[in-house]
Amino acid sequence: GQLDLAKKHMEMGISLLEQYQLLYTNDSIPQINNYAVLLTEMQEPALALSSLQKLAQIIKEYNSNHCLDYAQVQESLGSICLITANISQAKTHFKKALKIYEDIWADEPELIEEKYKKIQELYPQAGIALAKSILPTKH
């Protein structure tokens, strides 16, 4: 009922963004991210991943693959891969996102640390050892 209606409206919104060539704009990114979350909740993770991969490609094309928007999409891709138990792919996406965060926020270590913690908290189902394996060791 409600989820199907939400999906329909989100698809209409994304279709309009596509029609007017606005998918690359910063405002479309949260919409497509939310759409991917909804699809995952509706047991359609493959469609969610496809939408996010398309968005990542658009961001890369119109901006770069080394900006915060791209990192955010990589983080979302990682989360969905983790939910679907595709651990190695999740790890790849999280590493890409974290590398971008580290470079962009080089002078703001507290933001980087916050991201590491947020991503690490996604891992309890997959095991804490796995989370530690993607995070750099602190000296």
Protein language model features and the residues they cover:
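Conserved alpha-helical positions within TPR/SEL1-like repeat arrays
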Residues: 26-41, 68-79, 113-124
